[in-house]
């Protein structure tokens, strides 16, 4: 459950470390984003040689949330951190590597490139 002002970790190698959600996409009054949802973020922390710079506004997809998400079979999944992957306008990741596990919900939302780069899909 990600809302405006939420700080997320970056789960890719674009050089961004911390992202802050500034908009949840999908309707004018949408408050929360969950796994597989696209958000607009501001880069709050980045490495010096980063692809993205501090202060840059980027689109990202949520890949891990602390809030548990119910699956259709009745099981729940939650992670230790909130994390997102920075994406281009065509839903492909801007980085070339993904760090940490990602949720299976991304497969249903057509983020196949992120699924294929991820070391583990839970």
Curated annotation (Swiss-Prot):
<dbReference type="GO" id="GO:0003735">
    <property type="term" value="F:structural constituent of ribosome"/>
</dbReference>
<dbReference type="GO" id="GO:0022625">
    <property type="term" value="C:cytosolic large ribosomal subunit"/>
</dbReference>
<dbReference type="InterPro" id="IPR005745">
    <property type="entry name" value="Ribosomal_uL14_bac-type"/>
</dbReference>
<dbReference type="InterPro" id="IPR000218">
    <property type="entry name" value="Ribosomal_uL14"/>
</dbReference>
<comment type="function">
    <text>Binds to 23S rRNA. Forms part of two intersubunit bridges in the 70S ribosome.</text>
</comment>
<protein>
    <recommendedName>
        <fullName>Large ribosomal subunit protein uL14</fullName>
    </recommendedName>
</protein>
<dbReference type="InterPro" id="IPR036853">
    <property type="entry name" value="Ribosomal_uL14_sf"/>
</dbReference>
<comment type="subunit">
    <text>Part of the 50S ribosomal subunit. Forms a cluster with proteins L3 and L19. In the 70S ribosome, L14 and L19 interact and together make contacts with the 16S rRNA in bridges B5 and B8.</text>
</comment>
<keyword id="KW-0687">Ribonucleoprotein</keyword>
<keyword id="KW-0699">rRNA-binding</keyword>
<comment type="similarity">
    <text>Belongs to the universal ribosomal protein uL14 family.</text>
</comment>
<keyword id="KW-0689">Ribosomal protein</keyword>
<dbReference type="InterPro" id="IPR019972">
    <property type="entry name" value="Ribosomal_uL14_CS"/>
</dbReference>
<dbReference type="GO" id="GO:0070180">
    <property type="term" value="F:large ribosomal subunit rRNA binding"/>
</dbReference>
<keyword id="KW-0694">RNA-binding</keyword>
<dbReference type="Pfam" id="PF00238">
    <property type="entry name" value="Ribosomal_L14"/>
</dbReference>
<dbReference type="GO" id="GO:0006412">
    <property type="term" value="P:translation"/>
</dbReference>
